[in-house]
Amino acid sequence: SPLTVVALPDFLIDHFPLKSTAEFVRLDGLTCDRRDLSQLQAVTEWLSVHLGDGETAYMITDDMLYNPGHLRNCLLPEQPLDGKLPDSFSVPGTHNFPMSFFEAKYVLTADPFPLSYASPTELGHRLNAKFLELRDSTHQQVATFDMGNGTVFTIWERTAPVTREEVETYLHE
């Protein structure tokens, strides 16, 4: 795959569980062979039309199959989401607390979540779970996109101003 280069000696390959190896190969194939490119472009175009000057969106999902970079770059050479779709939050010590999540006009979620190997305790999972729990009091659903591979993206628009209590709820998750 152009996105994932793995060179392992044969003795290591024999020690990988076949089920996890098969799942990696499946996800890697989906990443390389973008049969959902038109759907990615549709999500990007929807956001481009609905985000005004100074407005942003936040994508909770951040893995090898779907991440903000895929949406920012799916219409190359045009990049209509540059400056409008920041990187997501998932790696402690590397990514800062996602203030851009609270500043975003729109939040993108994916179902099913997760889409790759990240554990349920990974920060993106925890942010997604808390968002799903609280979304009805802060956001409303405005669009969905079937990616054609079992994944559905939902776009949620913020309907209530951010409160200190909301930020602290996510911070202490």
Regions found by a protein language model. Name each.
Residues 47-51, 75, 111:
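Sec/Tat-exported extracytoplasmic proteins
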Residues 1-2, 163:
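Short, acidic Gly/Pro/Ser/Thr-rich loop/turn segments
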Residues 2-49, 61-69:
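Membrane-proximal, lumen/periplasm-facing interface regions of secretory-pathway glyco-
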Residues 53, 58-104, 115-132:
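Extracytoplasmic
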Residues 102-173:
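Aromatic/acidic, Gly/Pro-rich catalytic loop(s) in extracytoplasmic/lumenal soluble domains
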Residues 50, 71, 155-157:
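A generic structural signal for ordered secondary structure
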